[in-house]
């Protein structure tokens, strides 16, 4: 099977397996603010990541590329929608284009239709400095995502089995590539120990890519003759991973992704410490169901709904939203307690804007 054929299968299986909504975000509840003293017109949703200013705390997370015409059309539509809504967009792994020049167009279209937007290049942790620079140049990218997908590779029939040297390669790329580097998980979550190593390696941010969204173990198991189903429930749920990493490194930039389905999930993620939230499966389904117009409408609604929630929480800015009070219960509370994290960090903190 060619890489392009595999990419097409990934899209098909991502749509068929869907999102399984075990993110843990249901365990997070806002403390209601009765006197927000704020108008929606005052809300400022700008956020800063790696020295870059995003107009919105929402971004289109890495999905696809390198699968011929079908992935070309998906990336083209996503980028058009990103341009229309001023939302950053990430491409899927560009390794296919580095190995087959005919696939470059499936990625380059993102910059072609969105010449002034924020675009993330993307490679796996096996990449070299040379490959990282080529990926960034291909898109004139503003940032580089490096994805960690050990479980996906293990379950993938033709996947990698040797993960030695990844941290050293990431550190070398972060030092040399010339744009901010974000390291992201792909649906299995990130622990505070992994995040610590990555921050020490010099990355600008981590995207925790929590369990609860697109499940790459399930996707790859659909492609196997003998399934490895024990990996289908493997990972740290989004809410637990995000809270664990943020509370351990409150001064570092953390991004949220993994099963984020609506504005409430976005708002909760930011309250847990994220500087921005990435959606992939939600946008892919929106595009499939409603085309470009439907996708753009959903993106606009998402942004407006976040503003309304910020208003009722009395949070004028993203930084103020990151200080709002939330109560964590259920499995997420249990996880954090067992990991030595005091959840009153979130529930009793004060923000003078609230009352």
Swiss-Prot record:
Q: Provide the binding site for Mg(2+).
A: 153
Q: What CDD domains is this protein classified in? A: IDI-2_FMN
Residues that bind substrate, according to the entry?
6-7, 152
Q: Which GO terms describe its cellular component?
A: cytoplasm
Q: Which UniProt keywords apply?
A: Cytoplasm, Flavoprotein, FMN, Isomerase, Isoprene biosynthesis, Magnesium, Metal-binding, NADP
Q: In which residues is FMN bound?
A: 62-64, 93, 122, 184, 214, 258-259, 280-281
Which E.C. number(s) belong to this protein?
5.3.3.2
The protein's required cofactors: FMN; NADPH; Mg(2+)
What cystine pairs are annotated? Answer: none
A biological process from GO: isoprenoid biosynthetic process
InterPro entries in UniProt: Aldolase_TIM (IPR013785), FMN-dep_DH (IPR000262), IPdP_isomerase (IPR011179)
Where does the record place it?
Cytoplasm
Q: Name one GO molecular function term.
A: magnesium ion binding
- What's its catalytic activity? isopentenyl diphosphate = dimethylallyl diphosphate
Its quaternary organisation is: Homooctamer. Dimer of tetramers.
> NCBIfam families, per this entry?
IPP_isom_2 (TIGR02151)
The family line of this record is: Belongs to the IPP isomerase type 2 family.
Q: What does this protein do?
A: Involved in the biosynthesis of isoprenoids. Catalyzes the 1,3-allylic rearrangement of the homoallylic substrate isopentenyl (IPP) to its allylic isomer, dimethylallyl diphosphate (DMAPP).
Please state what the protein is called: Isopentenyl-diphosphate delta-isomerase
Q: What gene codes for this chain? A: fni
């Amino acid at each position: 099977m060619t890489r392009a054929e595999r990419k097409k299968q990934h899209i098909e299986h991502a749509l068929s397996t869907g999102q399984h909504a075990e993110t843990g975000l249901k365990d997070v509840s806002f403390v209601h603010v009765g006197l927000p003293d704020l108008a929606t017109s005052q809300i400022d949703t700008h956020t800063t990541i790696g020295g870059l200013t995003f107009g919105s705390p929402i971004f289109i997370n890495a999905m696809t590329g390198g699968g011929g015409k079908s992935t070309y059309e998906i990336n083209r539509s996503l980028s058009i929608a990103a341009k229309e809504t001023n939302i950053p967009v990430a491409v899927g792994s560009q390794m296919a284009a580095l190995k087959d020049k005919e696939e470059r167009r499936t990625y380059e279209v993102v910059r072609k239709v969105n010449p002034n937007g924020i675009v993330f290049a993307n490679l796996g942790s096996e990449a070299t400095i040379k490959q990282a620079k080529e990926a960034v140049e291909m898109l004139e990218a503003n940032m580089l995502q490096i994805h960690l997908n050990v479980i996906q590779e293990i379950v993938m029939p033709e996947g990698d089995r040797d993960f030695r040297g990844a941290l050293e390669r990431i550190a070398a790329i972060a030092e040399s590539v010339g744009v901010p580097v974000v390291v992201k998980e792909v649906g299995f979550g990130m622990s505070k120990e992994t995040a610590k190593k990555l921050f020490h390696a010099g990355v600008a941010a981590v995207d925790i890519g929590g369990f609860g969204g697109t499940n790459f173990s399930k996707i790859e198991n659909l492609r196997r003759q003998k399934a490895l189903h024990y990996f289908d429930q493997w990972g740290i749920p989004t809410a637990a991973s995000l809270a664990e990493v943020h509370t351990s490194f409150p001064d570092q930039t953390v991004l949220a992704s993994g099963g984020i389905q609506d504005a409430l999930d976005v708002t909760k993620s930011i309250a847990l410490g994220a500087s921005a939230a990435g959606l992939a499966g939600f946008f892919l389904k929106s595009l499939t169901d409603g085309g470009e117009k439907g996708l753009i409408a959903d993106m606009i609604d998402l942004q407006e709904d976040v503003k309304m929630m910020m208003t009722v929480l009395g949070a004028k800015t993203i930084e103020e939203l990151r200080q709002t009070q939330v109560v964590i219960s259920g499995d997420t509370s249990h996880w954090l307690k067992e990991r030595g994290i005091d959840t009153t960090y979130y529930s009793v903190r004060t923000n003078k804007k609230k009352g």
